[in-house]
């Protein structure tokens, strides 16, 4: 699923089971592709508010001792120039084996009027 938010275009590429976190809990690795549609350099962290839910509950962000395959720990904070497209990977701690819902909204839009969302089986 993909769509336009206020200052960016975002695509939720995938959500796949990944390595365990530092607490040996199972995780899901979500990959986002985004384009900076502002007039200045920006990062995904500054523009987007990504959240992942399972059974209606928000999942905690995963912290890894050893980075799993395809995980780029710096991608969330890396800046893109205007018009550039990049990839962000974020891990989340799973509660069980049920599907996850990935939502991306504007960071400072509390009405959630612009939202990109998709459900993934784990």
Where are these regions (language model features)?
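Short structured motifs
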Residues: 13-18, 71-76, 87-88
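Hydrophobic core residues within well-ordered beta-strands of beta-rich domains
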Residues: 28-30, 86
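Short, solvent-exposed mixed-charge patches
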Residues: 121-122
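Low-complexity, acidic Ser/Thr/Pro/Gly-rich terminal tails and inter-domain linkers that flank the onset
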Residues: 1-25
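Short, surface-exposed ligand- or partner-binding patches at beta-edge/loop junctions that are enriched
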Residues: 87-118
């Amino acid at each position: 699923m993909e769509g336009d938010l206020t200052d960016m275009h975002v695509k939720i590429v995938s959500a796949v089971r990944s390595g365990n976190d530092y607490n040996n809990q199972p995780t899901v690795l979500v990959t986002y592709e985004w384009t900076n549609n502002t007039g200045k350099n920006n990062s995904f962290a500054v523009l987007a508010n990504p959240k992942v839910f399972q059974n209606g509950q928000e999942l905690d962000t995963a912290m890894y001792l050893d980075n799993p395959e395809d995980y780029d720990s710096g991608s969330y904070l890396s800046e893109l120039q205007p018009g550039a497209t990049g990839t962000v990977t974020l891990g989340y701690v799973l509660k069980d084996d049920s599907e996850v819902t990935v939502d991306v909204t504007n960071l400072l839009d509390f009405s959630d009027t612009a939202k990109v969302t998709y459900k993934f089986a784990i």
